[in-house]
Amino acid sequence: TNRYYWIHNAFSSTYEAYIKKAVSQWVHTTDSLGVTTPISIKKTSTRSKSVFDFLKGTLDVGVLGQTSFYKHGGTLLKLNKKGALSKNYSYAYIKLDTSTLNSIPAAQRQATCAHELGHAMGLSHHMISSSIMCQYGDGRNAKRASKNDLKAINHLYK
């Protein structure tokens, strides 16, 4: 099943390229990492078709990106005490603070796009620096999803 992502036109072409590459590196993994995932995510220009919306916005000091989950009709779903959703969601908003992102290396800007998309697909934080799901502030050096990140996707989606 195809899932779609949408990019708000407030992003520069540079950030649009970061987002597109981040998505591609989650989807096209067999040749590069030897792990095949069942996910298919394609870009759409029709926001109503999208389940992953990339938005530009201002976040709290030091926060690079934030993913929020919604039910149809716009109801925001809150995370429980364990940081998990207690209900299924219909779509996710991935908000990126480009002014804060501009203070980190370019490769980590793209990695942050991939990190937030990982959340939108259901992954939580890891403290392993080689995982895309490690926060930049916790020492992330990954530039794309690792084999273990992809195996976690396979666990969720197969």
Q: Can you name each region flagged by the protein language model?
A:
Residues 1, 5-6, 26, 115, ...:
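Broad hydrophobic/π-residue packing in well-ordered secondary structure
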Residues 1-20:
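Fold-level signature of zinc-dependent metallopeptidase catalytic domains
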Residues 3-5, 52, 94, 131:
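A broad, low-specificity signal marking well-ordered, structured residues that form hydrophobic/aromatic
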Residues 7-9, 56, 98, 135:
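Pocket-edge structural micro-motifs
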Residues 16-114, 120:
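Metzincin-family zinc-dependent endopeptidase catalytic domain
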Residues 81-108, 124-158:
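Metalloprotease/metallohydrolase-associated module, dominated by Zn2+-dependent proteases
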